[in-house]
Amino acid sequence: MILAILVGCVGTNTDVYHGYSKSGVISSFNVTALKSRHLEMVNALRLENGRSSLKYSSSLSAASKTHAFDIARQQRAWNYGSDASSAIDRAKIAGFEGLVLGENVSETYEGEYDVLNVWFKSKIGREIILDPTATDLGLSWYQDSTGKVWWVQMIGKS
């Protein structure tokens, strides 16, 4: 009986983007909720590893959005802008006054849970996410006409 009550309390989130094959267009979902879920997942991983929580940065997210669109246009998930800009350059232009510690990028048909899992399993991605000096996180994406999502996550220290 207790198990049934607990399961009822957990509920299900029907507003989760699980990837192109399951739900289609990411833009049909609440952008704020998706970014909040991502921040919560990152903070859970950080807390499990003895790190402090990050806060959402609108300037890092703006820089991430610009880069997501740019790498989609380039058809290449990498850390360089088509104008040869770096993550540091893009964050500065977007108004971030702190230090950019790292940027994770991905091109995939997967959702935010899966892409975070991939980043966390890679040595460099994990180091960026768990940087002990980090204080800020930005996330954005661009979904092209084929359904492919170009994700960009930036971690910084304000």
Task: Walk through the language-model features, giving the residues of each.
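Short, surface-exposed glycine/acidic/tryptophan-bearing loops
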Residues: 16-17, 61-110
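Short, low-complexity, intrinsically disordered N-terminal segments
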Residues: 14-15, 153
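A short alpha-helix/helix-coil micro-patch that ends at or immediately precedes a cysteine
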Residues: 15-73
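A well-ordered secondary-structure block
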Residues: 86-158
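N-terminal Sec signal peptide cleavage junction
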Residues: 9-12
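Sec-dependent N-terminal signal peptides
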Residues: 1-3
